[in-house]
Curated annotation (Swiss-Prot):
This is Methionine import ATP-binding protein MetN 1. It is found in: Cell membrane. It is an enzyme of class 7 (translocase). Residues 2-241 form the ABC transporter domain. Belongs to the ABC transporter superfamily. Methionine importer (TC 3.A.1.24) family.
Length: 346
């Protein structure tokens, strides 16, 4: 559906060349929600703007819907872009026309017949639950409603791909959740492929199937959301994963606790998140866990929980208890023995 082959982008100024995107290859499957996450300056905005050639790559190939966009003429590219919708952080609505006209006007410019325009505007305004505001002006809408209009406008061209450039960054948490729910609904009901960029891990965990982590213009790690959450490899990826969980244990507290036991992180995925494995381990072995912090969150299709505990007891009993927890499908990290990679607490 979307494939980037060795794509790079260099911005040239009078004094210096800035390599915003290093040789990057990426594949997004048809019908999936693929997220790209990174801090400011990571290159994610440059990458997504290269996908529809809003930014022309310096090198490499951009293949969307089996077409290499870098080889198309201006006329062919304009036609190909009609199948690539895009939404932005800033909404980009026309302030002087109504909600209806914000969607209808681009369709008129594309030569769509009047009856078809009327049908599409109503259809997609109903999908985003804003048909009753079709005669309102953007100034009369909330931020979330403006983004819903932008989504309806992008969908009205009936694209096969939807690009989302930090579409929820300007919204409050509650509105962000409603927009993410809408994007998930669109993906599941229409089957549209979504490629989004964000700096917020909650966006990734809520709706994405797979994710790529970017830093300094390059993809440093990628995989399914489940893989990234349960087994992050790069230090930056670990920071993003830990940002989804509020608690941090100060270094001095860690040092003090490690004198009397082990600090261990238990990660639960899917069905294991509801099993009383820790309680069973406590009864079966002579160990005494003290819960330091814990959280459970929802990935796209399954629960994921993380529990940080201070476990006391004889070392042999602790080892048996942690082995038992692993046998129950729980990921064990930290401690003095080799149960997994040490997690980052702060």
């Amino acid at each position: 559906m979307i494939e980037l082959k060795n794509v790079s982008k260099v911005f040239t100024t009078k004094k210096v060349n800035v390599e915003a995107l290093k040789s990057t290859s990426l594949q997004v499957k048809k019908g999936e929600v693929f997220g790209i996450i990174g801090y400011s300056g990571a290159g994610k905005s440059t990458l997504i703007r290269c996908v529809n050639l809003l930014e022309k790559p310096t090198t490499g190939n951009i293949i969307v819907n089996n077409q290499d966009l870098t080889t198309l003429s201006a006329k062919e590219l304009a036609k190909a872009r009609q199948k690539i919708g895009m939404i932005f952080q800033g909404f980009n609505l026309l302030k002087t026309v109504t909600v209806y006209e914000n969607i209808a006007l681009p369709l008129r410019l594309a030569g769509i017949p009047k009856t078809e325009i009327e049908k599409r505007v109503e259809k997609y305004l109903r999908i985003v639950d804003l048909f009753n505001r079709k005669d309102a002006y953007p100034s009369e809408l909330s931020g979330g409603q403006k983004q819903r209009v932008a989504i309806a406008r992008a969908l009205s061209h009936e694209p096969e791909v939807l690009l989302s450039d930090e579409a929820t960054s300007a919204l409050d948490p509650e509105t962000t959740d409603s927009i993410l729910d809408l994007l998930l609904k669109i993906n599941e009901e229409i089957g549209i492929t979504i490629l989004l960029i964000t700096h917020e891990m909650n966006v990734i965990q809520r709706i994405c199937d797979r994710v790529a982590v970017m830093e300094h213009g390059a993809v440093i790690e990628s995989g399914t959301v489940k893989e990234i959450f349960t087994n992050p490899q790069h230090v930056t990826t670990k920071k993003f994963v830990n940002s989804a969980f509020a608690a941090k244990i100060p270094a001095e507290v860690q040092k003090e606790l490690q004198r009397t036991g082990e600090i261990v992180t238990l990660s639960f995925i899917g069905n294991s998140s509801g099993e009383p494995a820790l309680a069973i381990a406590t009864k079966r072995f002579q160990v005494y866990p003290n819960i330091l912090s814990g959280n459970i969150t929802q990935l796209k299709h399954e629960a994921y929980g993380k529990l940080v505990i201070h476990m006391q007891g004889e070392q042999n009993e602790i080892n048996h208890a942690l082995s038992f927890l692993q046998e129950q499908g729980i990921i064990v990290e930290g401690g003095r023995t080799d149960y997994g990679k040490q997690v980052l607490f702060g």
